[in-house]
Amino acid sequence: MDLYQFILIYKEVIMAGSTYSRQEEARYTLQLNKMLDALPRFLVEYFNSLEFTKQPRTKIAYAYDLDTFFDFLVQNNRSPLYGMDKAFLRLSDLDKVTSEDISDFLRYCKAYDNNGKIVTNSDSAIKRKLCSVRGMYKYFYRMDKIKSNPSTQVDMPVIHEHNIVRLEANEVAELLDNVESGAKLTKHQAKVQKKLAVRDLALLTLLLGTGIRVSECVGLDITDVDFDNDRIRIIRKGGAESFVYFGNEVREALIDYANERKDKIPLKGHENAFFLSRQNKRLG
């Protein structure tokens, strides 16, 4: 496969076709509707207002954040909504929540116990959660459906920016080409690379085609890869479960590796790992 072909593949994976985009949007819409069934009824109006301004994946992220927010409010014994049923909260209940309650929520998000699992969030993740809460309050306040907007009184976490180095399309194509061909390697490196080429191509294609984090990629279990629905199940940095859909190019690369993976014998404790190292352990 030459460089030109790889560039075409990259564009298809990143930009996606209109048909795939519609399918992806439908899947995310179904997921959002399922989440809204367990959230306060008034949130349906808010998410309807986002229909033509936010991408489906963004709305899913907002729903996760607000789900965590309302879980905190009904489970925290200092909250004015403590002990109430999350799904049956009324819009008027938002007026009972103070800026101190929201600050408590952000502090809680730093690290909390979720059914025996410790969930942590970075400052950027906490900032996103506050943005989600602010967006909800801003909408209902603007529509004169609540009396105040306490979220504006809560300071945003300070995020230290890092320079992001991005690859151009031709650089990505060359990278994938080198992975497949083993170009620019020593004889020893080429020998090792030949054994891992299918895995490495699958790993890189998945990363580039979905935008997931490296940690999410290497953390995949065999059962997390769903070829029936062309999606993977990942656990986000904040501990939230998410499904990410992939296109045909990613699917083909993953199937090639999955077939090769069947012949490997993982070390004890690594049987569930999808991506294996040379030592047949989970990557990482």
Residue ranges and their predicted role:
Residues 2-284:
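Conserved catalytic core of the tyrosine transesterase superfamily
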